[in-house]
A protein has these predicted regions:
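ATP-dependent carboxylate-amine ligase catalytic core
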Residues: 30-39, 44-55, 80-166, 184, ...
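Hydrophobic beta-strand scaffold residues
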Residues: 85, 205, 228-230
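Nucleotide phosphate-binding/pyrophosphate-handling subdomain across enzymes
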Residues: 149-154, 162-172, 177-180, 190, ...
Length: 309
């Protein structure tokens, strides 16, 4: 049942968020029942908004772990290089608006309210999932904000994820592990096949960590799509030894993935100086609002927050 504001008055921000949570199935709240296979709703929403994702360049990131760290770091570096950057990630920790940012600033409450109020007569009959609706909101917002480039994080899997309507400059798959096996498959090769669905024709793909069970999956898909492929864990990068703000040994793998991504973007004509990389690497949280990556909340007693899973 859809929530309406009392007396048909304009909804507040909190009422709007409650409406979204109640009306659009959300994976974090109800689990597998929220998952909708297929891109029909996404395409319908995108067409309704005149394909906003075609108005800016895109970097598309999938993987079991490390998507958030890689997404925020690349956004930080590109912002430091002078680009206006959209950032779409999930889930949020505190406020829904964390999911959609431009140059580190969350989408405004007023925009969220306006989007829902103006467009719900169209999307209610579609019964979109929470993530389908959020993705449509992000793409439209980035187009209206005239971002230069957007970092788009996959929600679940890749092949059938609603972000997979994009044609990016660069695709990244951070790693493969067992997660969401009820949707993606029960072997690493099956999961890799789903995530390899983001590999686009003639578009470079970076694999952060490869495994014997998954390497051939990625390699074969890249060959079939005529897409240059880089296995980041097999080749050193000239930026991987730069100082990095995010702590934890596991971040070393992300750094190499990010470094190769930067090199690929530079080769495509993105203007990214070493100074921008150094600043971006050491000011990720300040620049993008990233939280929960081995984040020390207090010293005495030590209290650390990390969202790793």
């Amino acid at each position: 049942m859809y929530l309406r504001a009392k007396n048909n008055t304009k909804m507040t921000y909190q009422e709007t968020i409650t409406y979204l949570f109640n009306s659009a199935p959300m994976f974090q709240k109800i689990g597998s029942a929220a998952y909708k296979e297929g891109l029909e709703n996404t395409i319908a929403l995108d067409n309704h908004f005149n394909n906003p994702h075609k108005n800016f360049r895109i970097i598309h990131i999938a993987g079991t772990n490390g998507k958030g760290s890689c997404s925020h770091t690349l956004a930080s570096v590109l912002q430091a290089a002078g680009y206006k950057v959209g950032l779409f990630t999930s889930p949020h920790l505190i406020d829904f608006r964390e999911r959609i940012r431009v140059n580190g600033e969350p989408i405004s409450q007023s925009y969220v309210i306006k989007f829902v109020e103006e467009e719900r007569s169209f999307f209610e009959p579609l019964h979109p999932s929470f993530f389908e609706l959020t993705t449509a909101m992000a793409f439209r917002y980035f187009a209206e904000e005239q971002v230069d480039v957007a970092i788009i994080e996959v929600g679940l899997g890749g092949r059938l994820d609603c972000t997979n309507i994009v044609n990016p400059d660069l695709s990244i798959i951070t790693n493969i592990s067992y997660d969401h096996t009820q949707f993606l498959g029960h072997t690493l090769a099956e999961i890799a096949t789903e995530k390899a669905g983001i590999i686009k024709s003639d578009t470079p793909i970076i694999i952060g960590e490869s495994l014997p069970e998954t390497k051939s999956v990625f390699l074969n898909k890249a060959i079939n799509m005529h897409s240059p492929i880089i296995f980041a864990d097999e080749i050193s990068s000239k930026y991987e030894d730069f100082e990095f703000e995010l702590k934890g040994i596991y971040q070393q793998k992300n750094i190499r993935t990010i470094s190769h991504a930067i090199e690929q973007l530079q080769a495509m004509g993105y203007h990214i100086s070493e100074d921008a990389i150094k600043y971006g690497f050491t000011n990720i949280c300040k620049t993008t609002g990233l939280m929960g990556r081995w984040q020390q909340l207090q010293d005495n007693p030590p209290l650390v927050c990390d969202t790793g899973h």
